[in-house]
Amino acid sequence: MSPSEYAREVAKRRTFAIISHPDAGKTTITEKVLLFGQAIQVAGTVKGRGSSQHAKSDWMEMEKQRGISITTSVMQFPYHDCLVNLLDTPGHEDFSEDTYRTLTAVDCCLMVIDAAKGVEDRTRKLMEVTRLRDTPILTFMNKLDRDIRDPMELLDEVESELRIACAPITWPIGCGKLFKGVYHLYKDETYLYQSGKGHTIQEVRVIKGLDNPLLDTAVGEDLAAQLREELELVQGASTEFEEEAFLNGQLTPVFFGTALGNFGVDHMLDGLVAWAPAPMPRMTDVRKVSADEEKFSGFVFKIQANMDPKHRDRVAFMRVVSGRYDKGMKLRQVRTGKDVVIADALTFMAGDRAHVEEAYPGDIIGLHNHGTIQIGDTFTQGEEMKFTGIPNFAPELFRRIRLRDPLKQKQLLKGLVQLSEEGAVQVFRPVANNDLIVGAVGVLQFDVVVARLKSEYNVEAIYESVNVSTARWVECDDVKKFDEFQRKNELHLALDGGDNLAYIAPTMVNLNLTQERYPEVRFRKTREH
């Protein structure tokens, strides 16, 4: 393959994730984006309880029952002359760890905001994570077919709460029952909305020019006058779109529409392929790796168990950073120092898998994993380096887990260790006894673990409360001091799923006192994979 062909393949890749508060319409937008990418023909509606058409990107049992996306799916589709990789992140308020890690694998994010509610709590948290790497953000103000807050107010709120400048690209005409469409500030065109056409790609009527009398006829004189008035304000008060500020994460282009009505999603996609960056460089512990390098490198940011109910398998999701993956290629797994032949990597359309012959920077491929791959693993063509910045967070909630049938202890431990390797939950085994303590960042993770232990490992487990309020990973350079620390604090020490030593504190006061007592021991809140 010639360097120019390779460069062309890299340049057309766009890899992004959608971030939003639960129920802001993320799964619906995912559906509609895939519809435009022609990946699915009729978009499945998400929330209908008991309806057999499940949304394409929610595929685990529990997600199907609850109507929320629990695990990160990956979907690739063509749009214009680009190839877009969309990483779907869990929308429920709990699933933060998986989501945080997914954001390390993308080059750009789409923030979906419910225009009736504005900026919500989860959106704030996720924006903080994108800030760590100055990820470029596009914004979609959703649900214009309902009654929404004043659009100017929404922009002000995003600017003040999320500290990012807003540049409106489209502007709404009416909302709720009176929603007529949007005006495109940079193309000087009005796109008219028709309700009830959400399942397919609409033929949208376009009116050129803001002063076109056809506009008054189409939306009514009152709304047309209101639009012209608002636009004068907008053009006076808001920021112009600047690509450089967008790429530095300082400015977000804002689009208005309704995902359910499939209106406005294509304007956002047009913006995404036009402005979002092609695959970006990534830092390792040795140097920066850029996408145009010939040699292959990539990192694992997520492990997903049982994507195929017929096989008890696990798949490691790897983001390709540089070079081209070819079927049957030999790669070095840096952590273990072993060379492995990757003959059957996968590509995804949420749960439908296809074997991939080749993959380029920006692509996400799945590696079959029988317990040898961990989150954060780097694969190269021999170079010794490790990609950095893939975090593990100290859990905030703890429960003791035990069996209804004590004979299944082995399966329980196996299930918990596998689920912890996947990042679904963290498991701690106290040094002093045989308890198993499960730590999570959100309550829903506990339900997921019990449900998955039952369906995948046939283990019935129940929770009990446990006297643990927080955990910290501990390390120390002074062997003698560390031995003394371990001897005196045996009752509070535990090993996590990867056999790393952690201090599990009954109270914050206890933790603070212990930290004061042993200044030479480092107590860490996060652990790099």
UniProtKB/Swiss-Prot annotation:
Any one of the GO CC terms: cytosol
Any one of the GO BP annotations: regulation of translational termination
PROSITE patterns tied to this protein: G_TR_1, G_TR_2
tr-type G domain mapped to chain residues: 11-280
Binding site for GTP: 20-27, 88-92, 142-145
Matching InterPro entries: EF-G-like_DII (IPR053905), EFG_III/V (IPR035647), G_TR_CS (IPR031157), P-loop_NTPase (IPR027417), PrfC (IPR004548), RF3_C (IPR032090), RF3_dom_3_sf (IPR038467), RF3_GTP-bd (IPR041732)
Classification lineage: Bacteria, Pseudomonadati, Pseudomonadota, Gammaproteobacteria, Enterobacterales
GO MF assignments: GTP binding; GTPase activity; guanosine tetraphosphate binding; translation release factor activity, codon nonspecific; translation release factor activity, codon specific
Keywords assigned by UniProt, alphabetized: Cytoplasm, GTP-binding, Nucleotide-binding, Protein biosynthesis
Family note: Belongs to the TRAFAC class translation factor GTPase superfamily. Classic translation factor GTPase family. PrfC subfamily.
Biological role stated in the UniProt entry: Increases the formation of ribosomal termination complexes and stimulates activities of RF-1 and RF-2. It binds guanine nucleotides and has strong preference for UGA stop codons. It may interact directly with the ribosome. The stimulation of RF-1 and RF-2 is significantly reduced by GTP and GDP, but not by GMP.
Protein location: Cytoplasm
Protein name: Peptide chain release factor 3
CDD domains in UniProt: RF3, RF3_II, RF3_III
